[in-house]
């Protein structure tokens, strides 16, 4: 039986669990895409049907997979469990002419022996909804980039690009920057005091009310603050009451794609691309202290499943 995954690292990890009865090969990612030098999408009649081509660097891989699939009893498509992975499996079936009757889709969210055994015990067919979702995203990416980028070349400079997500994100950044520039700072003051009760530990308190008024008092400038301080000095204070309560702090939930990138940026100063590259390696499997290759995390692209 033939098993197709995306990368050699993933192939090694999966192959270790499956054993020699399975021939595990890597497609090296997508094997087909829209043509580089033309739109590749039918827009004249507004059908928006894409035309795909096998990239020159993938022709040898497709040829080898086609030959292996023809001689295999069953072809297991074990690409990633999201719309990109589903689309890769669909493109493989089309490009390598894999017989629909012998093709089976297996999905796992972690590369462990238990997860792989479960996936291969419960294969399914291709999810056409996920495939169509990926195609819609790819077509939109091409239409926006292909049509708008030349406008930017003429208006701004050559090489400037537009994108379905990129352009919206840039607009949000620009709008936020305008808000920052238009912000008029307003001076305000707060008053805090450190109390030293006789024989007790010190504690701090903030001025939250004057003469029983509701709401924190507004102190617009230093003069107002000094006036309030003059009234407060020499006054006797008493603790009118206190409250103790037990609080529970829940552990943080497991990372999703966005929170993983945010924490890696905050703690380690990693870029989003570096974070995802490292996460991909941890998912597909790495060698630890000379041991066999093992996958260490679940699938990291939670926003596209």
Name what the model sees in each region.
Residues 12-16, 60-70, 90-94, 114-121, ...:
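Solvent-exposed alpha-helical segments within well-ordered globular domains of core cellular machineries
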Residues 70-71, 111-198, 241-248:
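C-terminal or mid-to-C-terminal helical accessory/interaction module adjacent to the motor/catalytic core
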Residues 1-135, 147, 216-220:
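Intrinsically disordered, low-complexity regulatory segments
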Residues 86-87, 110, 134, 138, ...:
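An alpha-helix initiation/capping motif
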Residues 270-305:
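Extended, well-ordered alpha-helical scaffold/bundle regions in very large, multi-domain proteins
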Residues 72-76, 154-156, 240-247, 258-267, ...:
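Glycine- and acidic
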Residues 4, 55, 78, 82, ...:
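Hydrophobic alpha-helical scaffolding
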Residues 23, 32-54, 162-284:
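Long, highly charged, low-complexity internal segments
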């Amino acid at each position: 039986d033939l098993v197709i995954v995306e990368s050699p690292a993933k192939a090694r990890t999966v192959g270790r669990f499956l054993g020699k009865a399975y021939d595990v090969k890597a497609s090296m990612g997508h094997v087909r895409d829209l043509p580089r030098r033309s739109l590749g999408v039918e827009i004249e009649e507004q059908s928006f049907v894409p035309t795909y081509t096998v990239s020159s660097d993938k022709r040898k891989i497709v040829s080898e997979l086609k030959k292996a699939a023809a001689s295999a009893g069953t072809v297991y498509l074990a690409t990633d469990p999201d719309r990109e992975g589903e689309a890769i499996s669909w493109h493989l079936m089309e490009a390598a002419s894999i017989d629909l009757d012998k093709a089976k889709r297996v999905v796992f969210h972690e590369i462990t022996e238990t997860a792989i055994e479960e996936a291969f015990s419960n294969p399914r067919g291709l999810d056409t909804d996920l495939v169509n979702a990926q195609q819609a995203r790819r077509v939109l990416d091409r239409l926006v980039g292909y049509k708008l980028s030349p406008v930017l070349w003429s208006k701004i400079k050559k090489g400037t690009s537009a994108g379905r997500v990129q352009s919206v994100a840039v607009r949000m950044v620009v709008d936020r920057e305008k808000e920052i520039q238009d912000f008029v700072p307003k001076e305000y003051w707060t008053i805090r005091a450190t109390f030293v009760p006789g024989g007790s530990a010190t504690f701090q308190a903030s001025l939250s009310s004057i003469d029983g008024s509701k709401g924190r008092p507004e102190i617009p400038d230093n003069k107002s603050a000094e006036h309030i301080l003059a009234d407060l000095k020499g006054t006797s204070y008493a603790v009118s009451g206190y409250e103790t309560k037990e609080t529970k702090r829940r552990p943080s939930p497991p990372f999703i794609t966005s929170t993983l990138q945010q924490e890696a940026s905050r703690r380690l100063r990693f870029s989003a691309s570096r974070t995802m590259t490292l996460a991909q390696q941890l998912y597909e499997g790495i060698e630890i202290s000379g041991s066999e290759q093992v996958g260490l995390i679940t699938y990291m692209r939670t926003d596209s499943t």
